[in-house]
């Protein structure tokens, strides 16, 4: 899906949520820390969800 091509967005807030995003350069779902606000669709709560949607 097109959301898988969106860049990783940490966002300006300072919360600490462990999430996963699809890295289109490596073709893998990769963990990152999300700040809790803003961002885009390339932000998954689980590795399984990221892999399922982005077929990683």
From Swiss-Prot:
Keyword match Mitochondrion: no
Pfam families membership: Kunitz_BPTI
CDD domains named in the record: Kunitz_SHPI
GO molecular function: ion channel regulator activity; serine-type endopeptidase inhibitor activity; toxin activity
Residue ranges of domain BPTI/Kunitz inhibitor in the record: 4-54
Family: Belongs to the venom Kunitz-type family. Sea anemone type 2 potassium channel toxin subfamily.
Protein name: PI-stichotoxin-Hcr2p
Source species: Radianthus crispa (Leathery sea anemone)
């Amino acid at each position: 899906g097109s959301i898988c091509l969106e860049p990783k967005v940490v966002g300006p807030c300072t919360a600490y949520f462990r999430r996963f995003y699809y890295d289109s350069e490596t073709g893998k779902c990769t963990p990152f820390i999300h700040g809790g606000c803003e961002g885009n669709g390339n932000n998954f709560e689980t590795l399984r969800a990221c892999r399922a949607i982005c077929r990683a």
